[in-house]
Amino acid sequence: MTDHTNADTLRTPIVAVLGHVDHGKTSLLDTIRGSAVSEGEAGAITQHIGATDIPLDTISEMAGELIDPTDFDLPGLLFIDTPGHHSFSTLRARGGALADIAVLVVDVNDGFQPQTEEAIDILRRTGTPFVVAANKVDTTPGWNPQDGQPIQRSLEAQSERAESMLNENLYEIIGQLSDAGFSADLYWRVQDFQKNIGVVPLSAITGEGVPDLLTVLMGLSQRFMKEEMAIDVQGPGEGTVLEVKDERGFGATIDTVVYDGVVRNGDQIVVGGQDEPIVTEIRALLQPRPLEEIRTEKKFEKVAEVGAAAGVKIAAPDLDRAMAGAPVRVVRDRPVEEVVEEVKAELAEIEVETAENGVVVKADTLGSLEAMANALREAEVPILRAEVGDIAPRDIAVAETANQDEHKAILGFNVDLLANAETELENADVKLFTDEVIYQLIEDYETYVEEKQRAQQETVLDKVVRPSRFRILPDHTFRQNDPAVVGVEVISGTVQNNRNVGYFEGNEFERVGQLSGIQKQGDDVDEARAGERVSIAIDGPTVGRDIEEGDTLWTEIPEKHAKILEQELKEEITADEREALAAYLETKRKRDPFWGK
């Protein structure tokens, strides 16, 4: 990295646009691109692979009076086109975020949504400066559109009612930013952008407020990031893989954003791979053909070199195991081993902590894998294996080895189930969860675990002897023995058929026999609850000798069952069962304080 800050060596700041699905990220990028193309003459935009480069002259044309181009020596802005399904967290560079600055798009009517919260978390974690684009101002009831105008000029044309409704929504968003720990205000009221987040009201459809957004982005980049934009224009290129794609005639290619130095055709490069760094040689550097030539048979044209900052498609052998989000390094005049170690070191920063038992995690890129691992750690969900890529048969085989049923699960973020893994999954005892929102994915898994644990507890509850205390009613002896049949009232707990029963003599439990039948109003039943009166048949005792009318009897609880009831199922049993259990344990523990512990 050089210390130069002359215009020749200042690169274009990299801008990422992120936000909740349907809040208008794509429309905003399309509007910025479209307006830039329509301004045309002043130095039309360059469409890169995975990015759009808008030069300062074009921004100046679009922003009109808001910008004086002589105030700037940065060359323009490079907007990264992160498709809706791509998490911003994919964009890493040297341990931080690839983007120098971000635009968080929020629907002015909806405010913060799940993916907004997720984006805010990532921005906070990576320390990326950002502005908020409060989109869809044109949907405010009674709005009078002023196409392409700066927002304050547009506001002058609105009725008091429309402006007041918009302000209400804007201050709702400013409040939500405050709740997330960020001080924010409408951008023209912000005195210090290092301490406060600027909110830019705009419409991606009418273009209102878009000049303001470009002005704020240029101003922030020029003021606070100029030194970081200084690059060694001839140095070995450094970049980040956006996506790995198969292209006809080229095989596996990597869409890459170059953020430092220069990449040339024929360069030897090192790329982060799924198993180990890939050392290969560039066969072709590809850029999209200009828009007017897009209908030609060839989508791409070859270029000799690409300097930072730019998006480019790199074609080279052995790239099929390259990872989205991984580093790309040009070797040039250095030992290749040194560059391999550099890439390994960067990948090591993203190593996910795994446990001997846990779930399998798959994500589309290294950055999102890292974000998933962080979120799972916070949720205290252990990870057995974490990898980039779609879900393959071996992932299912690994998930099946988990010791606990709840860990026999795969959590996939922005990934697909490969065709050859579908049959495996159908035949395996493995649960698959996929989603495009990390927090939703984890919430679905946690709900599944809770339901599974509840079902297991219910199964245990079905097998365990339930506590009960009941009294033989006076004048309710229907048969004295073989079996004794008496009427009883259940005082607390649940009387179950086929259980041993008895009474306490001092602190000793005396078993008198086993229940062999329960009848309620003449019908056979399996159990009787607190407050019910039923007749029961007891094999073993004789009424008048072993038991008497008025006696209180208890269900005999095996010690192992008492321990499970007290330690694992206390919340699952009813209040009166807890009462019967507590009284039973209290009496048993007078003789042996450690009974059932």
UniProtKB/Swiss-Prot annotation:
Record-level Gene Ontology MF annotations: GTP binding; GTPase activity; translation initiation factor activity
Protein's UniProt keywords contain Nucleotide-binding: yes
Region (G2): 44-48
The entry's keywords: GTP-binding, Initiation factor, Nucleotide-binding, Protein biosynthesis
CDD domains in UniProt: aeIF5B_II, IF2_aeIF5B_IV, IF2_eIF5B
Function text: Function in general translation initiation by promoting the binding of the formylmethionine-tRNA to ribosomes. Seems to function along with eIF-2.
Protein name according to UniProt: Probable translation initiation factor IF-2
Species: Halorubrum lacusprofundi (strain ATCC 49239 / DSM 5036 / JCM 8891 / ACAM 34)
Name of the gene: infB
